[in-house]
A protein has these predicted regions:
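Soluble non-cytosolic domains of exported or imported proteins
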Residues: 59-67, 112, 116, 180-188, ...
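His/Asp/Glu-rich mid-to-C-terminal helical/loop segments that flank catalytic regions of hydrolases
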Residues: 102-105, 109-113, 120, 195, ...
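Short alpha-helical segments and helix-capping/turn motifs at coil-helix boundaries
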Residues: 62-70, 74-75, 138, 150-152, ...
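Structural recognition of the beta-strand scaffold that forms the well-ordered cores
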Residues: 1, 78-83, 110-113, 152, ...
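Metal-dependent peptidase/peptidase-like ectodomains
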Residues: 5, 31, 110, 160, ...
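Extracellular/luminal Protease-associated
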Residues: 1-101, 109, 182
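Secondary-structure transition/capping motifs at alpha-helix termini
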Residues: 159-161, 196-206, 230-236, 273, ...
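Soluble metallo-hydrolase cores and metallopeptidase-like ectodomains found primarily
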Residues: 99-180, 192-205
Length: 373
């Protein structure tokens, strides 16, 4: 499995039924092939070649998670166990979620198990041994609707209070772990950048918004609401910095030519801010890409779809800690200890410097050449 629950919708049933039907055809062909191959055993190699007869291939069966799911549920199974790669990935019930109500809540536990533990069980089944399995499963359902809340910190601009620079990360995480990286690494950097500017007595000319978004994992819900309801005028946003990836360190940023001089000025302090982490501003080469037409990826998406600049730092594992994002992405290893403290510290510095610098320009960033018009 890839982490998603079993699709028990009508579409899922139809996919499984099609696979079952195809497997019946494969079974028929395999029986014929086995009979043919058996007949060749009584023939000499010379006779086989003379008659042009060779062994037929035994075809593999098609696979699909819980192929006989509907039939097993009707037979009264108590649960499903699937083998999982380690670290175990769990994803939300994307295919079933729109069909769920309090009247048809899931009744069959869908268990993702370490593939090595699964193999022990599978071998016992193959040996036709009797055994019992016990799982302690604690799922709780609550009557909706469930409210989601964005948390927005506001540092009001002294000269251009109705113009904005934003930074953000998302508050929610998958329950399989604590979200220490996804997106604790983003939330903590945004909060620390806010603290640094405030403690330094910063008085930005332009308003800075420190955004902690709700519901990113379930469809960018918080940032989508913010953009679609024009919580602030989108044309007044200079840039939105999104942090939702590994706990790595900013070492450069690439910007359109029209923004290059501004970013060189704003990011100048970062070139010497830390001796271990050089920082460069790069001018984008070539033609701009098209404005995104669909949302995806992270909370920058709806801003970008509406033409708001969402330029972000290039992050690197500069000291070679060998961080692997896919090791933590929606897995049981997405915990606090996977963050890299020194990278987080410097990321906060970079974010604070960039936010404060853009907020203190005498103009919002020029969007010329940001996207292909």
């Amino acid at each position: 499995n890839g982490g998603f629950p079993i699709d028990w919708t009508e579409k899922g049933d139809s996919i499984r039924n099609a696979v079952i039907k195809e497997n019946l055809e494969i079974e028929k062909k395999n029986r014929e092939a086995m009979m043919h191959n058996r007949s060749l055993k009584d023939m000499s190699e010379k006779d086989r070649k003379k008659k042009g007869m060779e062994e037929k291939e035994i075809l593999p069966y098609k696979t699909e998670p819980a192929l006989f799911y509907k039939q097993m549920v009707e037979a009264g199974i108590l649960g499903i166990i699937q083998a999982s790669e380690v670290p175990i990935t769990t994803l939300y019930d994307r295919k079933n979620i729109d069909k769920l109500s309090f009247d048809n809540l899931p009744a069959i536990p869908d268990i993702k198990l370490d593939k090595q533990q699964y193999a022990i069980i599978e071998n016992m089944v193959d040996r036709r041994e009797y055994f019992q399995l016990e799982f302690d499963i604690r799922n709780h359902f609550r009557m909706g609707p469930v409210k989601y809340h964005n948390v927005i910190g506001v540092m009001r601009g002294t000269e251009y209070p109705d113009e904005y620079v934003l930074a953000g990360g998302h508050l929610d995480a998958y329950d399989v772990a604590t979200g220490g990286v996804d997106c604790g690494n983003g939330v903590s950097v945004v909060m620390e950048a806010a603290r640094m500017i405030a403690e330094a007595g910063g008085k930005p000319k332009r308003t800075i918004l420190f955004c902690l978004w709700a519901g990113e994992e379930f469809g960018l819900l918080g940032s989508k609401y913010f953009v679609e309801n024009e919580t602030v005028p989108l044309e007044k946003i200079s840039n939105y910095f999104n942090r939702d990836g590994g706990p790595l360190v900013p070492t450069s940023i690439t910007v359109p030519p029209a923004m290059y001089d501004d970013f060189v000025k704003v990011c100048a302090p970062l070139a010497e801010a830390h001796p271990d982490y050089p920082f460069t501003v790069n001018k984008r080469q070539g033609e701009p890409g098209a404005r995104p037409a669909k949302a995806g990826g992270s909370d920058h998406a709806h801003f970008a779809m509406n033409g708001v600049p969402t330029l972000s730092f290039r992050l690197t594992d500069h000291k070679g800690y060998n961080f692997s994002y896919m090791e933590i992405w929606h897995t049981e290893r997405d915990t606090y200890n996977k963050s890299i403290p020194e990278y987080q510290d410097h990321s906060s510095t970079c974010t604070a410097v960039a936010l404060y610098g853009l907020a203190n320009l005498d103009h919002v960033l020029d969007r010329t050449g940001l996207y292909k018009e």
